[in-house]
A protein has these predicted regions:
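Periplasmic-binding protein-like
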Residues: 35, 116-129, 201-242, 261-281
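Short, solvent-exposed loop/beta-turn-alpha elements that line the ligand-binding surface or hinge
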Residues: 41-59, 115-119, 139, 268-280
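Extended ligand-binding regions for polar small-molecule ligands
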Residues: 58-67, 130-132, 144-145, 150-153, ...
Length: 281
């Protein structure tokens, strides 16, 4: 009899614990970002904690979190790790300058488009200052080593447009590593979003645009948020927030503010490790 009572009490306790878990209200929106992509997402080294992460996408993420009644928590990590984290469900979503691609549509739920500015729809190639303006056609990259960030739209564009013309693709985990490779002669050029190229050039006077811009299919021109395939309810809420932001006409102001912030002395593109730890100096 005592054993039966103990079992019943244990079962009741278990049910109450399960019930409490079900009733627990979500308070945080976790968003994976790779803060090495100014002016979209980067770091203000004069600040610490969550406040150090700045840029257009951070402003957008804060807006979405506020619309959902949640507190934003940025989870910094490498660009390809952001995508893995969404697939594994270890974060709610990722906002990190993602363009639409067929592969992303297959592997994720994609939000409606958001527009960060004309400079983020153009895709360009940068090189050392001595070669500024010397290449305007794909054929001009024959024999060149052209870098791109892993799992990025730029990697795809190099594969489609420059490799057939005789270029060699070199993939880097981070933009920082790719820029260093360009400066040290390990690669001849680097494919970038035009706005990111402007930010890189403003901080590195030894780098310039080649003069070549990719011909980009319009479907690649706007940005999307990545969500797990099972997050249909969250996707609806995110899309509602994006629609409200678009109707309010706030995107241009956010982008201009981010560009200005990317030019301050404490602005830095920081490449985090896959596990979210800060790089060692």
């Amino acid at each position: 009899m005592k054993r039966a009572i103990i079992i019943l009490l244990a079962a009741a306790l278990l049910l109450s614990v399960v019930g409490c878990k079900k009733e627990a209200k979500k308070t945080t929106l976790t968003v994976a970002m790779s803060p090495d992509f100014a002016p979209m997402e980067f770091v203000d080294t004069s600040k610490t904690g969550q406040d150090q992460f700045v840029g257009f996408d951070i402003t957008l993420a804060n807006y979405i979190a506020q619309e959902l009644g949640l507190t934003l928590e940025i989870k910094p990590m490498s660009f390809d790790a952001c995508q893995t984290a969404v697939q594994l469900g270890s974060v709610d979503m990722s906002i990190s300058g993602f363009s639409w691609t067929a592969e992303r549509e297959e592997n994720f739920l994609l939000s409606d488009y958001y527009i960060a500015g004309d400079n983020e729809t153009e895709q360009s190639v940068i090189t050392v200052k001595a070669k500024e303006g010397t290449v305007t056609e794909p054929a001009g990259f024959a024999g060149w080593k052209v870098g791109a960030q892993a799992a990025s739209l730029q990697e795809k564009l190099v594969q489609e447009a420059l490799i057939p013309a005789g270029a060699e693709l070199v993939v880097y985990k981070s933009i920082d590593d790719a820029v260093l490779a360009l400066q040290t002669g390990k690669i001849d050029a680097l494919a970038v979003a035009h706005g990111n190229g402007e930010a890189i050039i403003s901080n590195n006077p030894d780098i310039a645009f080649t003069g070549y811009d990719f011909e980009v299919d319009p479907k690649y021109e706007n940005n999307v948020c990545l969500l797990n395939k099972n997050s249909t309810e969250l996707l609806q809420k995110v899309n509602a927030a994006l629609a409200k932001a678009l109707a309010a006409g706030v995107y241009d102001g956010w982008y201009n503010d981010a560009k200005a912030l990317a030019g301050i002395s404490t602005a830095s593109e920081v490449s985090y490790n896959d596990d979210g730890t800060a790089p060692s100096n």
